Each structure stands twice: as C-alpha cells, then as structure tokens.
C-alpha cells in the first residue's frame, strides 16, 4: 500500500515557474532538515512498513471505489465515488497527517503544530499526535472555530491545544501565518505539519506523495471493476491536497481527463478588499503566498485578498504550486461552482445515495451537472468524495433557515 515514494522535480522545489522557497532565512535550516529527513526515510523499508500499518489498521485503508447507481442513473453515465469520507476522522486528511507525524517521529521531533480550516486537518493531526505521543497545537481561524465548533472540540478531546487566530480574515490563511511564527520560535523540537500541497518546498512534494495513496488505489480499483482507467476524474480544490493525491498517479495517462473544481463562492468577482470566491486557478494571478510562487487572489497592488466560500476547507486565497502548473499547462482542467450549487449537490447525494458529503466534496459533485451538459464526463467517471458532511450540517441548516 505505502509503495516506495518517488518524487521528481524539474528543478529543486519548482513546478515550471511555480513553487520554490520564499521564506525568511531563519526557516531555511528547518526546511533543509525536513527535506533531508524525507529523502532519507521515504523509501526506507522500516518506515514504509510502519506507514502501511497505520494506513491500514488506524486509518482504515484501502477505501472503497463505490458505484453510485442512483447518481449514475440521473446523469446517464457510470459514476464511482472514491470513499475518502470513510477514512478514520471522516476525510482524506489523515493520509498526510499520519505520514508526516511518523516522519517527525523518525526525525526525533516531540511537538507537532498545524493549521486547519474546516477542522479536518486539525482533527487528523490531533489523531496522529495522540497516537504517536506528540504534544500537539493547532492554529485555527476564529471564524472557522465558530463554524466548526464540533471539530475544535474533537481536537481538544484528543489532547490538542486549539489556538483561535483573531487576525486578518480569521480563516485558514491567517492560521497558516500564525503556525509559521510558532515554527520559527520552536524549530528545534517542533515539526510543522502542513495540511495541503502549499507552502515552501519540500511541503507540496511531501503532502502530494502521502496523499497519492488515493490515486494509486483508484487506479487498481478501476482496473478491477471496469477493466480500464476512468474517462474523467473530478476532485475539489482549495489548497489542492485531495486533488493532487487523486490526480498524481494519472498525470502520464493522457486519456484520463482531470478536473479540479474550485469554490466559486457568491460570484467570481472581487470587491476592493476581498474576493467573493476562492477560485485561485480560475481567477487568480501569479504571486507569492506562504513561501511559494503560485496562483493567488490579489489586488492590483499585489496584496492578498480575503477569500470566501461556504466551505471552510476551500476558503483559501491560493492553491498548491504543482496544481497551478498542471492547470496552466492544460493537463488539469480548472472549473468552479458557486456556494448554492455546492449546497444543492450536498442535498442531492444525501437523498440519492444515503451518503452525506462534506461541503468541500460537494463542489466536485456539483460539477457533474455542468460536465454532463458540456460532454466532459465520458462513460466512466470517478469523483473523489474527500470527506463526510456531518461537520457541515449546522452550516447547511443555517442556510436553509436563512440565518
């Protein structure tokens, strides 16, 4: 399961013109230490055997590739769901969290810090930290703590200290900023467990590699169930970890269409100080955010705009540099759906299949309707169901009540 991990970059830390290490000099030793540790252990048989054990017996892998018969009937094609919602904790986030936590253990670290938006990555970090015996601190935007109170409590229940961030937009972007500040102060004993394919090298590579278990499983399961690879694979994209994890094993399979669906929020436009969406691939510009050159939402002066989405996990002003490069090259197609369309898809899957999806995953599901109309689906489609939706029930209920 945890096959030997091979990571290739054209230039160290670069994906075409994106990526790199745009960080203060004080962080360079920590990034170099992390890269050296990862290169040392990523193909180590003992490390891989232990990672395989945790993925199988703790996380519950492999996850099913489920034929959604009622959804398939509605859209006139075979639609399979990759059930990452069934991973321990309710989302794909544990794939990366357990991988990085185990790496930190092998590197001799005793403390984990992380950022979180929807709370899924924070929860996954809390789970991994508790299981592997780490002191764990999670930074979470105060706005996100309010809309994801249950996840904040779950983290605290597992011994994690949750620190609300009350600066800026009080969301994921600001939580990442605070986590970096913590890391600078505590580099000696602390590993910063970034939750998406963002940040300075080597993070986008490491997170992608640990999440690629999704795509590797899809590849094997597709051959078992249909005898061939899918025509189309759809995944939501905020920072992009579930999308990259699903897409990466298929990059060289040019007949497989890869579609990343972003959060279109209220509308694909911006005010003077904020975007009304979180669609960096569709509407962003080249810039630097959290240590990497990528596509970001920014104003005419290059200042980062606050993003907006009904989904806390997609509410981010940038995107992973490798995903930005793949979208720019045309290998990945970037699309977006609005808040309303995502909520409609949330309700639709719940009614048709008895599966309540996360609002993040609902963005990928919502694009099925548009893709069917545009002829992008083909005869065999896989949608990555990146998480379950119990965390979002209060949000959807509030929208229904008009609160």
From Swiss-Prot:
Enzyme superclass (EC): lyase
Keyword Amino-acid biosynthesis listed: yes
One Pfam family here: PALP
Highest taxon above the source species: Archaea
Cofactor(s) it depends on: pyridoxal 5'-phosphate
Role description: The beta subunit is responsible for the synthesis of L-tryptophan from indole and L-serine.
Protein name (record): Tryptophan synthase beta chain 1
Organism, as annotated: Methanosarcina mazei (strain ATCC BAA-159 / DSM 3647 / Goe1 / Go1 / JCM 11833 / OCM 88) (Methanosarcina frisia)
